[in-house]
Amino acid sequence: MNTIYGRILFLFILTIFGSCTIYEKLFDNPVDFKANEERGIGAPSFVFYPKTQSVTQNDSILVGSFIVFQEDSIEPFAGVHLQIEFPNDLIELDTILPGLFITDTNKSTPLFTYTYNNESTVDIYTYFLDTLKQDINGTGHLADLIFNPVSSGSDSIYYNLGECEMIDHLDQEIIVNGIRG
């Protein structure tokens, strides 16, 4: 009789400990230059966050655009031009908002404008204008793009790195080494 209870107890313990799933942690911090470097994305770079999204037809899609520098190679910059391409057969652009990083010391909205061709490309221009500083440096949030789904499917939003640029206050171009779209 004890052997039956012993076997049942053994099977119960085996079931409890054998059914545990160990998950691999995936960290998707867009401004983590070390994680970007491990993926072969050099700094400075432009990244989107979140990396992937699943939404229903009634949801909106919020995508943040970030600039990432390494701690030892931060260059001061004053303006950024981003050209972002997206699948207009799946999503439509709704709203573009300035990011918090490029606001001035008075926390006012930066010079922030965009052009949109009602197709699949949007150009964002943002400039740091401040009374105390000419440039800013660091890693941060440049813009938020809000899209609405128009049909189902999967595709990517990406930077056209050939058209993206970053400049200092003297209008000198700063090399962008990579993107993480």
Q: Model-flagged regions — what are they?
A:
Residues 1-18:
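Sec-dependent bacterial lipoprotein signal peptides
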